[in-house]
């Protein structure tokens, strides 16, 4: 195969970035915007020895699972929705198969065991308009007009769009007010290459249970000229609760700055997951799909199977979202998180919910737990620290082996693993199964419909119980 070759390909799988995967005479091709079941004509744009990348030129025979009219006309250009052109039922089947395949292949979990413990994926009734948070870059088009939207896949080129199919409806109104304000008052948009211009991004957060709205303008400066004019328009939107600016003068592609200045209202909004209330600031980590998060955490609580006498460790606890869920049913919960701001939020969230049996530690889970285990042994005459249940919700890279070993050494009866990457989940499950734990329940949860991402909740139990 060579660059510019035109080939006909039957698509058999989806890659980690959402690309369709097919083979021509044993040669693997990755083709963006093609889905499983399509037969496509594609032009090779990059040819390696054993695989290549091709551009979709024509759909010869569409898959029976192809959506005739995608909900968002920008889907192919924008980097946000990789598989929006696939019917939702097929998306769920693909994600469930991906989790199962990784557990079989990487985790070496026997098929018979998976048949027994794996539950069907938990999907959404309405797989659009589910995101409670959106970050919109601000820039200019070729004519110099101020625009906002989303970055095209793997670029920092803005695709103009104020009406994202995954975001809430009020986003469009807010963005239009901000764009008009900037044009009318000659407020400049940030230019990433030149590091000039004022407004970099707009962050919008929405409380699904409270209808509270936050708007935060990320700025390459300390002050927004004519801010009162913008505030006057925005605060008339029903539910508007917080209008702030985030100062970010660094030459970086990190979106938020660390300094938040209040323009109007308060610096946070509130929302609920189940009956637990959370205060969410512009810098808070908070799950973006509250409908599915409630199901996800409900499963984690179910798998922990608490009776009120347990000591629970929640590793990578963020702002305490899972910890505070668990604290309602446990004797004591300890949460660990590396981000100090998140721990401040976690402690505050415990306080506003009158939860007194949750303590939080700042630090790397990989360091805090082994250190606690070691110090406990030293101060208790060699007696080992014990936890009844350990919950982990790590980033995509999964858990470090040293942390997994400490978990095993602490001999919890149950381990609940919440994963956003089924490949690293499978690797870690393999370690735990080889160290005396067995799979009891697995449920994938579609936290991000129309994308390739999938969350999974796994319950493991010590074999000698």
Listing of model-derived features with the role each one plays in the protein:
Residues 43-47, 137-141, 205-209, 463:
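Short beta-strand micro-motifs enriched in acidic
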């Amino acid at each position: 195969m060579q660059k510019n070759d035109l080939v006909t390909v039957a698509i058999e799988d989806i890659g980690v970035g959402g690309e369709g995967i097919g083979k021509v005479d044993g040669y693997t091709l990755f083709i963006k915007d093609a889905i499983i079941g399509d037969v496509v004509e594609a032009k090779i744009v990059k040819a390696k020895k054993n695989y290549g990348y091709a551009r979709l030129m024509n759909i010869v025979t569409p898959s029976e699972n192809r959506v005739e009219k995608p909900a968002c006309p920008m889907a192919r250009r924008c980097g946000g929705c990789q598989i929006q052109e696939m019917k939702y039922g097929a998306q769920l089947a693909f994600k469930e198969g991906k989790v199962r395949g990784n557990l079989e292949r990487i985790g070496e979990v026997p098929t018979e065991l998976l048949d027994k413990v794996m539950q069907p994926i938990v999907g959404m009734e309405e797989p659009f308009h589910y995101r409670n948070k959106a970050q919109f870059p601000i820039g200019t088009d070729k004519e110099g007009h101020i625009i906002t939207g989303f970055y095209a896949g793997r670029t920092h080129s803005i695709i103009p769009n104020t009406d994202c199919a995954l975001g809430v409806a009020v986003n469009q109104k807010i963005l239009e007010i901000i764009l008009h304000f900037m044009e009318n008052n000659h407020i400049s948009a940030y230019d990433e290459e030149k590091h000039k211009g004022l407004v970099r991004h707009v962050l919008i957060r929405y409380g699904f249970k409270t209808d509270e709205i936050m708007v935060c303008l990320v700025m390459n400066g300390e002050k927004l000229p004519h801010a009162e004019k913008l505030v006057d328009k925005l605060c008339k939107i029903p539910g508007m609760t917080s209008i702030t600016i985030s100062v970010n003068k660094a030459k970086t592609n990190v979106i938020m700055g660390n300094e938040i200045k209040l323009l109007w209202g308060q610096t946070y909004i509130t929302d609920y997951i189940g009956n637990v209330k959370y205060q969410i600031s512009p810098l808070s980590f908070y799950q973006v799909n509250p409908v599915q998060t409630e199901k996800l955490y409900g499963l984690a609580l179910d798998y922990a199977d608490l009776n009120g006498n347990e000591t629970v460790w929640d590793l990578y606890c963020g702002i305490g979202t899972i910890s505070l869920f668990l604290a309602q049913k446990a004797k004591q919960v300890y949460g660990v998180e590396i981000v100090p701001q998140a721990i401040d939020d976690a402690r505050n969230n415990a306080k506003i919910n009158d939860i007194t049996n949750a303590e939080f530690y700042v630090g790397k889970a990989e360091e805090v737990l082994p250190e606690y285990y070691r110090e406990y042994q030293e101060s208790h005459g060699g007696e080992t620290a014990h936890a009844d249940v350990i919950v982990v919700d790590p980033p995509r890279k999964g858990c470090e082996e040293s942390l997994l070993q400490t978990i095993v050494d602490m001999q919890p009866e149950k381990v609940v693993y919440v994963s956003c990457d089924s490949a690293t989940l499978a690797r870690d499950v393999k370690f735990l199964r080889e160290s005396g734990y067995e799979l009891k329940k697995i449920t994938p949860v579609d936290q991000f419909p129309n994308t390739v991402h999938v969350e999974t909740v796994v319950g493991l139990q010590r074999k000698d119980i």
